[in-house]
Amino acid sequence: MSKALNGYPNVSEETRERVNEAVKELNFTPNPIASALSSKKAGRVALLIKLNTKTQAVDEINMQYLSGAINRAVEKKLDVITVFFSMIRDWNAEEIEDYFRSQSIEGIIIYGMGMEDMVLHQLIEEKRFKIVVVDVPIVNETTSSIQVDHEQAQYDVARKTVLENGGRSILYISGKLDGYVTQERLAGMQRLAREEKLSLLIKKGDFSEKKARELTFRYARDVDVIVCASDLMAIGAMRALQEMDIFRPVCGFDGITLMGYAGMQMNTVKQDFYRISSKAMDEMGRLLEGGAGRRMVLDHQIIRMQYQDVIS
C-alpha cells in the first residue's frame, strides 16, 4: 500500500487505482513522516544549527536560516528535520552517522560550524553524507560551500566608513577565533590597513555585545574609527561611546533588524540569510541528485539601517 501511495514505479496502474479508492473509502490520511521514511525518491535533509544560548538578540539570523531552508524544502518536496549542535556535542562520528541513518537522513546543511568542530570535519572528509556548509570554505565531491565573500564585504564596509569620516587608526573588534568567517573578515581588514596605510588595533570580541562594550571603554579614546565584525558588537560599541560622551564612527556586519533600533545609523554589511539558506537547500537538492560539490559565493550589500526600514 505504501509503495502505491508513494509513487513507486514498480506498482501497476490498476493496483494504484484500487489503493486510491480504498484510501478514499476509509478516509485514510498518509503519515508524512512514514512516507518520507519509506520512500526512496529522495532522502531527508537535516538542518544542523548552532544556537547562541547566551543571548536572544541574534535569534533572527537562525530563524531566517530555518525559514529559508524549510520553505524551499516544501517547494522541492524534500522532508527536513532540525537538529541542534547541543544534541550531538559529545558524540563521535559513528554515533552521529548512526543517528542520522536511523532518521533516514541523506543530506545535512550545517550552520555555524567552527574550525574546532573536528567530528563534523571527519563526517565531511569521509563523505558519509551529502553536505552543504554555510560560511565554511570546504568543498569535496559530496560537500558544497555557500557564503558571501566575507573578506571583501568586511573590506568594503570598513573602507566606506573610513573614507566617509576620515581617520587613520582603527579599533577592529573581531569574532570568535575558531570561526572561518572571523579569519576571512580579519584578512579584509588587514588588506585595507595595508592599502590605506592605517593603524589597526585588533581585539577579540567573540561576537559578544558585552565584550565589544568593554573593549570600547578601554580603547576607543585612542582610535579614530571602530569596526565590528557583527552588528551586535557594533551596538555594544555605540552604547559605550554614548556613555563615554565621545563620538567615533562605528560599523557592523550582518544587517540584523536590531540595528534599526540602535539609535545611531551605522554602516553594515547586509546578508540575506533567508536567501542564503534557500540557496543552500537548492544546492542540497542538486547534490542528492548526483551533483558534485562546489563553492558558491552570493552577493552582499553595504547599507545604513534606519528605524523606518525595520518597522512593519
Question: Each PLM stretch: what is its role?
Answer:
Residues 2-43, 312:
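N-terminal helix-turn-helix DNA-binding module of bacterial transcription factors
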Residues 44-159, 215-221, 225:
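Alpha-helical recognition/docking segments in bacterial nutrient-uptake
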Residues 73-85, 172, 189-211:
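Short beta-strand elements in bilobed, periplasmic/extracellular small-molecule ligand-binding domains
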Residues 104-112, 171-174, 203, 220-232, ...:
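Periplasmic-binding protein-like
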Residues 115-116, 178, 185, 232-234:
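Alpha-helix capping/helix-boundary segments
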Residues 146-172, 209-217, 234, 271-289:
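Hydrophobic alpha-helical segments within soluble ligand-binding/sensing domains
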Residues 157-196, 292-311:
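An alpha-beta-alpha
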Residues 221-312:
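Flexible loop/turn connectors
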